[in-house]
């Protein structure tokens, strides 16, 4: 279904990627609606012949990027990003590309959020299985932002049914935007993911506790030194 939307509206949007930089531009307005910066890592779980095997796969090279700034799904406005790529470990023996679809939605509460995603894999020299992985509706996800803000996270996790996950490392994401350029402006405001926000809160506390402990150690050492000096003074008298 998603693929049909992309094909239907392909003439309305253009998309591109350079290394780990992906964007979708509305050809009617010339404005960019989606920007995604980040490195993808796929943690895949296959249950084959009563055994469970796990594989970690990364990008090798991007084949093509498509997108849509004016999509509709279930009577809801959506924006889509479709990435076809060659994974690490691919060879001429297994030359089929992999495909990642990401769907963004918007509501009265948020400017954008990821509402759906699918990953279609093929056999490679490193992964002897293939399959289609879909979003786990029960998986926690916080790739969202309000107003004109973007999303930032050291590692954004997208859960898939069966225990697989998609990691987007060093991720900066925005959708439903109307940006003149295809990169984030220097004054872009970001909303930090929950995990990073907690880390930012914990680090000052830990540093403060370490400094307090260091002060106590120095003070105790000073007092012990003074006490020894006094005892030596009494002994000499």
From Swiss-Prot:
UniProt keyword Membrane present: yes
Signal sequence region: 1-17
A Pfam family recorded for this sequence: Lamp2_2nd
Subcellular location: Membrane
GO CC terms, sorted: gut granule membrane; late endosome membrane; lysosomal membrane; phagocytic vesicle; plasma membrane
Regions of this protein lying in the Cytoplasmic compartment: 226-237
Topology term for the membrane: Single-pass type I membrane protein
Extracellular side: 18-204
UniProt-listed PANTHER family: LYSOSOME-ASSOCIATED MEMBRANE GLYCOPROTEIN (PTHR11506), LYSOSOME-ASSOCIATED MEMBRANE GLYCOPROTEIN 5 (PTHR11506:SF35)
Official protein name in the record: LAMP family protein lmp-1
Organism: Caenorhabditis elegans
Upper lineage: Eukaryota, Metazoa, Ecdysozoa, Nematoda, Chromadorea
């Amino acid at each position: 279904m998603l693929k049909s939307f992309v094909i239907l509206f392909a003439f309305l949007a253009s998309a591109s990627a350079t290394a780990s930089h992906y964007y979708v531009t509305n050809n009617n307005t010339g404005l960019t609606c989606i920007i995604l910066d980040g490195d993808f890592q796929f943690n895949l779980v296959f249950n084959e012949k009563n055994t469970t095997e796990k594989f970690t796969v990364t990008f090798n090279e991007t084949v093509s990027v498509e997108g849509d700034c004016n999509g509709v799904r279930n009577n809801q406005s959506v924006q889509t990003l479709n990435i076809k790529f060659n994974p690490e470990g691919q060879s001429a023996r297994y030359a089929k590309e992999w495909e990642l679809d990401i769907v963004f939605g918007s509501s009265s509460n948020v400017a954008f959020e990821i509402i759906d995603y699918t990953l279609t894999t093929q056999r490679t020299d490193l992964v002897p299985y293939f399959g289609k992985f879909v979003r786990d509706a029960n998986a926690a996800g916080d790739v969202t932002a309000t107003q004109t803000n973007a999303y930032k996270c050291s590692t954004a996790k997208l859960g898939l049914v069966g225990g697989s996950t998609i990691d987007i490392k060093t991720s900066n994401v925005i959708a439903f935007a109307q940006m003149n350029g295809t990169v984030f402006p220097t004054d872009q405001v970001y909303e930090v993911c929950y995990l990073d926000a907690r880390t930012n809160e914990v680090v000052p506390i830990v540093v403060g506790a370490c400094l307090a402990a260091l002060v106590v150690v120095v003070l105790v050492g000073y007092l012990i030194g003074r006490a020894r000096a006094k005892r030596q003074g009494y002994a000499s008298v």
